[in-house]
């Protein structure tokens, strides 16, 4: 029986980003119609973590919009992590942009176990989707994460117009980093964003299978865009190699009801992992 790891995310600071990533509705440059706020109340975050745990999640990710982990953001994320840990037995993941070693060490002291920082795509293609920071900055952050002893979660977004060569280059870069977890996101179109999706179900299944074969020791997670690219047939991706899903809502888009996902997983004979 295949074990599936469930992860939930909390967008604790939304839409406050000055970067120009063409795939992201949280950039103020594109003016997407999303809910924007500076800080989510700590009590709300704890309650979301409790619900995630109740729904079977072993990981809970604290996400902030913005380029990187400045001092103010660091203090807030540490407070949120400590608040959750005090009341909920769940692994804390942080996703707060580019970060230096000292800041990452502080997160670790606060109880964060995993840091998520995606390369998004290949080094060659990245300048075509973002001009306000470099791919190399992202790669350096991933190296910093590993150097301080945090687990690294690092993946990308597919269907943004990248080529097969870009995907191969991206895989080579990930092999250098050896991440513990690899989230596979499939681009979600928005009328305000300048990109159009170039994926379909067959492409997505092929992508999942390729990453599962290349990274046999990593957790391969179906993340953003799962419902759009696979529809009701998303368990097919688990059968070709994925072993984790994000449950509940994403950063700025709605997800499937967690109880419905759980029902489908159990009905199809999957086991829910009880530790991250």
UniProtKB/Swiss-Prot annotation:
What Pfam families does the record point to?
Answer: BATS, Radical_SAM
Which SUPFAM superfamilies does the UniProt record give? Radical SAM enzymes
Keyword set includes DNA repair: no
Enumerate the spans annotated as Radical SAM core domain.
1-226
Q: Indicate the quaternary assembly.
A: Homodimer.
| Matches recorded under HAMAP family | BioB
Name of the protein described by the UniProt record? Biotin synthase
Identify the species of origin.
Nautilia profundicola (strain ATCC BAA-1463 / DSM 18972 / AmH)
Gene encoding the protein: bioB
